[in-house]
Every structure is written in C-alpha cells, then in structure tokens.
Amino acid sequence: NLFSYWYSDRMVLKMYRAREITEGDHPRLYRTVQRVTTQAVLPMPKVCIVPSKAPNAFATGRNAEHAAVAVTEGLLEILNEDELEGVIGHEIAHIQNKDMLIGTIAATFAGAIAILGSIARWGAIFGGYGGRDDNRGGGFGLLVAAIVAPLAAIIIQMAISRQREYKADAESGRITGKYEALATALEKLHRAPVRMKLDQRPASAHLMIMNSLSGKGLSSLFSTHPPVEKRIEKLQKLYQQSIYQGYAG
C-alpha cells in the first residue's frame, strides 16, 4: 500500500496509457483544469488524456504537488463546458481532500486486519479448535471472528470510499458552482452504452468518477462508489440550498 501510494501517479497513468498534454495540445481541457485548480487554490496538476471512447475521469498522485488529472477521449466528446468543469472539480476535490492518503490508510488498516484474521484462523484450526473439548467453544468463536473481522474491515473501507465520493461531488459544486452540471454529467456517464465502459481494473476502480464495477443489493456494500441516483439527488439538494443561501445573502 505504501508503494502504491508513493508511485500511484506513474502506475495508474501507465496502466491506462494516459498521455500528458500541454495547453497547446488540448486548450479546452487544460484551461478547464487550470481554472478549477486556481479556484481551489492548489498547484497545477499534470493533465492527461486516456485513449478510450469510454467516458470517465480520475485523479491520482500522493499529494497536490505530485497529482495528475486524467480524462478519456470519450468524456471530452459527450460533455459540454459546464459538465466538464463539474467533473474536473470532482477530481480536483479528491486532490484537495487528500483522498489518496485516506484511501491508503483505510486499505492498510483493512489489510492489517486481514493478516491478523488469517493468523487467528490458523491458530483456531491448529490450536484451540483442534484441541480439547473445553477449548473447542473458544476456538470456534475465534475462527468465526477471524473470518468476519476482515470482511467487516473491507465493508468499512468501501463505506469510507463512498463517503469520499459524496464529499468530492459536494466540493466540486462549492469550488465551481456547477452542481447541476455535475449531476447531468454523472447521468450521461451512467447512461453510456455497456460497450463503452472503460476497461477498469479492480485495483484502480475506486479512482474513477464512474465505477462500472459497482454492484447492486448486498454487493453494493463492497462498492467503492454510491449509486449514481443518490449522488444526483444529493447534488440537486445542494444546488437548491445554494440558491436559497444566495437569496438569503
């Protein structure tokens, strides 16, 4: 986890064949990132384009000084100016909120519990659970705890990730003022044909603004992203609040 945290920008950008661009290469994208970064009072990150028709975007990097924002060719084709600004605001918010660090800490915590659970599981099998009758009850309890604890840790890790997505959505609206535009962008990305979904790797799916690996029902407990419908609903409420506060001010 520490290795992936330190070298995440290089690893993920290479994984998706992202190409760093300059303002001359793609003025629209570069200037949008520049504008939002200035509004957030952050250093300018690397700006990259992923050669994929699947509409998606992500931010990576261990801190604001070593960050990168990448968007796919497909995203640039289907979003208008305001929607693009809303999406970039979401990614800049992840950088501002230090979500790579928080995600690394959560993953490390879950990994440590998984290791301890494995040790306890083998201890229960070869120790208490396999010993005398009066030890079997305690050994069985230890075995159950060893199985449940890592599962609970992963669920908590995913819940933290979902909350960070909500926070990044809200921060994007605060930075850019584009609550409605981000909501319509999420709707467009969600409705993209299945054939256009980005070939996501599970290890990096949590970085994307739209996770095509998310599940439904009980499997949603293991999803890194909240349901799109709930994200849009929250953005619409925040937009209404911003209007009311504007009138009240």
Where are these regions (language model features)?
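Polar-ligand-bearing catalytic/cofactor-coordination segments
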Residues: 1-140, 152-249
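Hydrophobic alpha-helical transmembrane segments of integral membrane proteins
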Residues: 142, 146-147
